[in-house]
Regions:
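Thiamine diphosphate
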Residues: 1-142, 145-308
Length: 308
């Protein structure tokens, strides 16, 4: 929808229809299930389609076909059929109820069998796309809506640069607490870590960047061996993707015995993002929220050093 003539709503495909023709860069009707269904059919016929859902909130209209058909194809065909479908969308932070949702828990529960990737910026997104172009797995890539106009360090080999699914990345080393997050929250975490450093608290920030699969090398557990404290920062509602991240770190990576204090989650409010230009700020975690949460955790663990 709108990827051809106008080059998508954020101009990510600008000029591609003119360059490659309407047969390769095609506008569709406004029906997400049909868009994904067309892509899935093309993928099963040997092509490598990239389909776009304008906003993450609208992916819910296509969730049934992604869950029933794309995610289960290799499983139910005993590996006999593959569909290298790439679904591109954008979400997390914007304005209003229908353009800034982060229903990642629902997606993670429904799409076992697909890759679910959540790059923190466009360079990381390009690395994932370069990898997926040579991969036979169906994948969902959720880009950051508030990341399109940021200036980033760009590798000279951007067309060859690859990011491997399943590999987390330490963005900042620290010794007092491990903060695990992804997507747009990475910038919030980094800004909060700077403030907390000035207050005498050293935060290790881990970008999961791939939720399915999640941190196959156990980087989060390695970090906990150093810090012994854990905070999950997530834009989904309470008990959404944060619950999945806790299960992966504490159970799959056996991180629970490494903790000296109960793990903490900091999530969005238990409702859809509020209306208005400031609705996102009051509905989702902010830098202030992170600083207050970390200080509260540290004051409970070491009240002598960090008074309540």
């Amino acid at each position: 929808e709108d990827v051809g003539k106008i080059g998508d709503v954020n101009q990510g495909f600008a000029g591609l229809q003119e360059k490659h023709g309407e047969s390769r860069v095609t506008d569709t009707g406004i029906r997400e299930m049909s868009i994904v269904g067309q892509g899935l059919g093309a993928a099963m016929r040997g092509l490598r389609p990239l389909v776009e859902i304008q906003y993450l909130d609208y992916l819910l209209f296509a969730l049934q076909i992604l869950s029933d058909d794309a995610a289960t194809l290799q499983y139910r065909s005993a590996g006999g059929q593959k569909a290298p479908l790439i679904v591109r969308t954008r979400g997390h932070r914007l304005e209003g109820i229908w353009h800034s949702g982060s229903p990642m828990g629902m997606i993670l529960h429904s799409l076992r069998g697909m890759l679910v990737l959540v790059p923190r910026n466009m360079v990381q997104a390009a690395g994932f796309y370069n990898t997926l172009m040579h991969c036979d797995e169906p994948a969902l890539v959720v880009e950051c809506l508030n990341g399109y106009r940021l200036k980033e360090k760009r590798p000279d080999n951007l067309h060859e640069f690859r990011v491997v699914p399943g590999h987390a990345e330490i963005l900042r080393e620290g010794s007092d607490l491990t903060l695990v997050t992804y997507g747009s929250c990475c910038r919030i975490a980094m800004e909060a870590a700077d403030l907390l450093q000035s207050m005498g608290i050293s935060i290790e920030v881990v970008d999961a960047q791939s939720l399915l699969p999640f941190d196959v090398n156990g980087l989060c557990a390695q970090s906990l061996r150093k810090t012994s404290r854990l905070l999950i920062l997530d834009e989904d509602v309470p008990g959404g993707a944060s619950s999945y991240l806790l299960q992966q770190i504490l159970e799959v990576q056996n991180g629970f015995p490494l903790l000296d204090w109960a793990p903490v989650t900091l999530t969005a409010q238990a409702h859809r993002p509020a209306y208005g230009s400031d609705g996102d700020y009051f509905s989702k975690p902010s830098v202030d929220d992170v600083v207050e949460t970390v200080w509260g955790l540290m004051s409970r663990a070491e009240p002598g050093y960090y008074p309540p």
